[in-house]
């Protein structure tokens, strides 16, 4: 029987592997919505994440709050995950992904072919386009990208993307920035059970307890941005999310007790002290 110490050590040493690249942290974070670049830097450090997603469109612009974003992060310590946020069509997403790959190379990550694929024509609910996502993924895979697609919690689409060659699938827990938590638990569980690539739950997580819940379900990793960046104290929330992610992973590997409809005593019933008195 494994001891708690042995299980913990093995868990911490077992890496998350995406497209052949190993990561020890299972929490990914972003760069958007922070009040200042300094707060973003502190939060990234506190989270202990190793993958940071960056919107290619944000880095390309010189608008206030965007300038110097890429340079504010030490890309020797963390892996860049360029994303195609803002793209409404498959064609647009492919073009932006190509820019993202070049951007990663300019920042010193010559072998970085990662892209977080987002095709979102819906501006109100920010729900991803399944057809456009699959079309863009197929093209990007042909061009040698490691594609991490953001999708609805659709088990059939997840399998199609996996079969197309995607490096992960990234089902949403609930709409981006909503903080509604895991609203698609049944479908996400099906995706996890049937996937042979890492499943990264992306969007909707609002609290560390929800992050733990997602990892307890068997997710391989989480991508959390808004819940950290919009917290009253982002660095502290980032630390909490990092700890919650690790805690949930350990709980999943340890295995929870089965639920029962009746009580079971914690103490043994054998050897009870006779408390009755004889007359």
UniProtKB/Swiss-Prot annotation:
Pathway named in the protein's UniProt entry: Cofactor biosynthesis; thiamine diphosphate biosynthesis
Localisation per UniProt entry: Cytoplasm
Single Gene Ontology MF annotation: thiazole synthase activity
Keywords on record: Cytoplasm, Schiff base, Thiamine biosynthesis, Transferase
Any one GO cellular component localisation term in the record: cytoplasm
Residues engaged in binding 1-deoxy-D-xylulose 5-phosphate: 177, 203-204, 225-226
Reaction equation(s) it catalyzes: [ThiS sulfur-carrier protein]-C-terminal-Gly-aminoethanethioate + 2-iminoacetate + 1-deoxy-D-xylulose 5-phosphate = [ThiS sulfur-carrier protein]-C-terminal Gly-Gly + 2-[(2R,5Z)-2-carboxy-4-methylthiazol-5(2H)-ylidene]ethyl phosphate + 2 H2O + H(+)
Presence of keyword Transferase: yes
Biological process (GO), any one: thiamine diphosphate biosynthetic process
Main localization category: cytoplasm
Catalytic center residues: 116 (schiff-base intermediate with dxp)
Family classification: Belongs to the ThiG family.
Function field: Catalyzes the rearrangement of 1-deoxy-D-xylulose 5-phosphate (DXP) to produce the thiazole phosphate moiety of thiamine. Sulfur is provided by the thiocarboxylate moiety of the carrier protein ThiS. In vitro, sulfur can be provided by H(2)S.
Quaternary structure and interacting proteins, as annotated: Homotetramer. Forms heterodimers with either ThiH or ThiS.
Name this polypeptide is given: Thiazole synthase
Phylogenetic placement of the source organism: Bacteria, Bacillati, Cyanobacteriota, Cyanophyceae, Oscillatoriophycideae
């Amino acid at each position: 029987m494994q001891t708690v110490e042995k299980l913990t050590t093995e868990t911490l040493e077992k890496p998350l592997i995406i497209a052949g690249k190993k990561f020890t942290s299972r929490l990914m974070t972003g760069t958007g919505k922070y009040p200042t670049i300094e707060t973003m830097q502190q939060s990234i450090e506190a989270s202990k994440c190793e993958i940071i997603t960056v919107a290619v469109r944000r880095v390309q612009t010189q608008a206030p709050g965007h300038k110097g974003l890429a340079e504010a992060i030490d890309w020797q310590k963390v892996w860049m995950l360029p994303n195609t946020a803002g793209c409404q069509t498959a064609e647009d997403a492919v073009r932006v992904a190509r820019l993202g790959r070049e951007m990663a190379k300019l920042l010193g990550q010559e072998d970085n072919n990662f892209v977080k694929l987002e095709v979102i024509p819906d501006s109100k609910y920010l729900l991803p386009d399944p057809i456009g996502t699959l079309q863009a993924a197929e093209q990007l895979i042909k061009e040698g990208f490691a594609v991490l697609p953001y999708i609805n919690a659709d088990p059939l689409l997840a399998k199609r993307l996996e079969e197309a060659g995607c490096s992960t699938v990234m089902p949403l827990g609930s709409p981006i920035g909503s903080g509604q938590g895991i609203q698609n638990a049944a479908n996400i569980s099906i995706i996890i059970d049937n996937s042979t690539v890492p499943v990264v739950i992306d969007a909707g997580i609002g609290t560390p307890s929800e992050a733990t819940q997602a990892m307890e379900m068997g997710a391989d990793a989480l991508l959390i941005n808004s819940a950290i960046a919009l917290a009253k104290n982002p660095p502290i929330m980032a630390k909490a999310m990092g700890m919650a992610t690790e805690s949930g992973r350990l709980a999943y590997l340890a295995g929870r007790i089965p639920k029962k409809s009746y009580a079971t005593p914690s103490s043994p019933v054998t050897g009870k002290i006779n408390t009755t008195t004889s007359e």
